[in-house]
């Protein structure tokens, strides 16, 4: 694992790289159009993937991307953490497709690139990945106008 100082430096670089392409309220859906939370909602939002006490941010809820035995399982085709899968569909509030959230080559968004790097940097530890990813999301939310 990276030393803490290097990790913080790395995360600040990643934040700078993606802060220009951030949009508001991106929702995640599996291939069957099952809802899996809001990617960039405020942490306190009950639908936020960063609300660790909510249905979509908990390590223990099967609908949470952070659950290794649920939608986050690396063996699932629609898991964001599958090397070979398509990940979850991303859509805005109008239902417009915004790409896939995936660490695989199908992950064609800045969010996917962030997730892929954080996934590797945290040695695939779901709790640490959630914490780092959500820290960046919070910082990105604070930059919105």
Locations of the language-model features?
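Short amphipathic alpha-helical "recognition" segments used for binding
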Residues: 11-12, 142
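Hydrophobic h-region of N-terminal signal peptides that target proteins for export
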Residues: 14-23
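Repetitive, compositionally biased segments used for assembly/scaffolding
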Residues: 22-145
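Bacterial N-terminal signal peptides that target proteins for export
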Residues: 2-10
């Amino acid at each position: 694992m990276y030393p803490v100082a290097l990790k913080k430096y790395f995360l600040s670089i990643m934040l700078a790289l993606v802060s220009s392409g951030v949009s508001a309220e991106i929702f995640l859906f599996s291939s069957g159009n099952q809802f899996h939370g809001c990617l960039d909602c405020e942490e306190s939002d009950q639908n936020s993937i960063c609300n660790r006490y909510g249905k979509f941010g908990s390590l223990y809820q099967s609908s949470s991307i952070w659950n290794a035995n649920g939608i986050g399982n690396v063996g699932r085709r629609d898991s964001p953490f599958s090397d070979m899968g398509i990940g979850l569909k991303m859509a805005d509030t109008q239902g417009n497709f915004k790409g896939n959230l995936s660490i695989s080559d199908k992950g064609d968004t800045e969010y996917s690139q962030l997730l892929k790097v954080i996934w590797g940097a945290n040695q695939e530890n779901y709790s640490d990945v959630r914490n780092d990813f959500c820290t960046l999301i919070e910082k990105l939310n604070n930059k919105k106008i």
